[in-house]
């Protein structure tokens, strides 16, 4: 099956893609392009899926970190620089290195300064976003020669507000950071709230002073044919879930 890849004009002409679950070799609950080695899927099948992504990106291998919901960023010049490192973002100014981020509701964020040949990729769930992983990625890119006013950031498929119910304690964490963050919460049912993760992500990107910030507009929870979703898996009491991959290279 052909791979289904979402791209964004803001990142052109760089090779990049927010890969959907279409076109992979996994089966069962992982059916499709599961790229998560942390899942209980067969390792050899996941490696085959990752090889298909690398081939689509025209690189021999993908650079990916051991994601832990942190704000830590790694500078990568070769895929081996990221292997096994606990972090949630990477930046690079070397050609033909594809940075790969795994998600299943969290925000995959791809960054580029095309003029100065610097790229970045971040895994930004609520905790990473709140703790500044996107801001940290921008700063690391600047350290590699990017200019803030040239950097574009694009948020890929993530869970949307209508599907992201949270409790009062969650709201409190965001209020503690900035009481203006209430604008990213809508009243839900039975004392719950609906959190706008992509809206908050766009806010943090724009506050970082970069050239532009966009979201592709895709909700992982509401489209099981295209996307894996951790929260949907929990609601369905499924055994496990796949991970989507988003990549960018110079």
Which residues does each predicted region cover?
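Active-site microenvironment for binding and transforming phosphate-containing groups
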Residues: 1-250
């Amino acid at each position: 099956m052909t791979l289904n890849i979402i791209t964004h004009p803001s990142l052109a002409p760089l090779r990049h893609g927010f890969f959907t679950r279409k076109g992979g070799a996994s089966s069962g609950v992982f059916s499709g392009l599961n790229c998560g080695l942390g899942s209980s899927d067969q390792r050899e099948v996941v490696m085959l899926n990752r090889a298909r992504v690398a081939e689509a990106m025209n690189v021999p291998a993908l650079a990916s970190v051991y994601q832990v919901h942190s704000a830590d960023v790694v500078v990568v010049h070769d895929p081996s620089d990221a292997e096994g490192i606990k972090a949630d973002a990477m930046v690079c100014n070397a050609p033909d290195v594809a940075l790969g981020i795994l998600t299943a509701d969290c925000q995959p964020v791809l960054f580029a300064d095309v003029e100065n040949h610097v790229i970045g990729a971040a895994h930004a769930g609520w905790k990473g976003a709140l703790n500044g992983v996107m801001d940290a990625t921008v700063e690391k890119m600047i350290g590699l020669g990017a200019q803030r006013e040239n950097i574009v950031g694009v948020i890929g498929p993530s869970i949307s507000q209508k599907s992201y119910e949270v409790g009062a304690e969650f709201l409190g964490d965001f209020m503690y950071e900035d009481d203006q963050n209430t604008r990213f919460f809508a009243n839900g049912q039975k004392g719950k709230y609906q959190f706008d993760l992509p809206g908050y992500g766009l806010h943090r990107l724009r506050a970082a002073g970069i050239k532009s910030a966009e979201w592709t507009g895709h909700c992982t929870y509401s489209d099981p044919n295209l996307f894996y979703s951790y929260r949907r898996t929990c609601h369905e009491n499924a055994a496990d879930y796949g991970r989507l991959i988003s990549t960018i290279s110079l």
